[in-house]
A protein has these predicted regions:
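A transmembrane-helix-recognition feature enriched in membrane-embedded lipid enzymes
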Residues: 1-61, 108-112, 209
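Generic beta-sheet signal
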Residues: 97, 118, 145, 177-179
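Conserved H-X4-D acyltransferase segment
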Residues: 7, 12, 45-98, 110
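Membrane-embedded segments
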Residues: 78-136, 140
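Residue-level preference for the first positions of well-ordered beta-strands
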Residues: 70-72, 139-145, 173
């Protein structure tokens, strides 16, 4: 039964992938000639995300109201599926690691939907913030994952604060989203994309699941006007932690060291 389920879902995913490539190629010349607006194309991308989740047998339940609006959107980060889940609910541009651009097919589609690619360790913060602000000025939502990497979901990792400058400089709202992959007990044993796992290995496990339900919790936007980025990042993290009803854990060693460095600088 598991083999049959995987095969059927893989076939459906392949069909949706080919459909995505066809749509992107057909719309490319129309977008260049401005016969199709970027907002319309982003709405199509959101529709495609929903089709892909359906092909994989994944259901999304939303708590709160997700209102498409220009701003910096943030979320906890557990899996590569996070992008499909959030993208299925609203047109949004993502900030993603540069490795995604090299993924077959997925990298092409991500580039077509205006993904901002971040190369780790390349000191690109200023360029990334500028690219995010350009999209904000054009009226788009831009989402990044402040944890900087995926985690198992036991707790929300420390947020990196630098990209919050994109919102602070333009007084753009911060829209907090919280993701939970339902399983009893938590966290989900299969979904987290961690421990140097390959994408194919993780996908293979996800496709074998009889059913996967994801809860996406939307919280009211936070004001970035006049905020200090580190304090804003900590406030955002706390909102997401409370939404997921996670305990405030003892700080992981890396965070303890970061706190000590901050005290020494002070």
């Amino acid at each position: 039964m598991t083999a049959l389920r995987r095969t059927w879902r893989l076939f459906r995913m392949f069909v949706v992938l080919m459909l995505g490539i066809l749509i992107a190629l057909l719309m490319l010349p129309m977008r260049r000639s401005q016969k199709v607006s970027e907002h319309f194309f982003m709405a199509v991308a959101s529709w495609w995300h929903r089709r892909m989740l359906g092909a994989m047998g994944i259901a999304v339940r939303v708590e709160g109201e997700i209102t498409p609006q220009a701003g910096i959107w943030i979320s906890n980060h557990i899996s590569w599926l996070d992008i499909l889940v959030i993208g299925s609910q609203a047109p949004v541009h993502f900030v993603s690691k540069s490795e995604v651009r090299r993924w077959p097919i997925i990298g092409f589609l991500a580039a077509q939907t205006g993904t901002i690619f971040l190369q780790r360790g390349a000191n690109q913060t200023g360029q990334i913030v500028s690219a995010m602000q350009e999209k904000l000025k054009d009226g788009y939502a831009v989402l990044f994952f402040p944890e900087g990497t995926t985690g198992h979901g036991h707790y929300v990792r420390r947020f990196h604060s630098r990209l919050f400058d994109a919102a602070i400089d333009l007084h753009a709202p911060i829209v907090p989203l919280a993701l939970r992959y339902e399983h009893d007990p938590q966290p989900h044993p299969v979904v987290p994309y961690i421990n140097q796992q390959s994408l194919l290995h993780n996908l293979w496990g996800v496709l074998a699941l009889p059913r996967l339900q994801i809860t996406l919790i939307a919280r009211p936007a936070l004001s970035a006007e006049g905020a200090e980025r580190r304090r804003l990042s900590e406030q955002s993290r706390e909102v997401i932690r409370e939404a997921l009803e996670l305990p405030a854990p003892a700080l992981p060693p890396a965070e303890v060291r970061a706190k000590r460095r901050e005290k020494k600088k002070a």
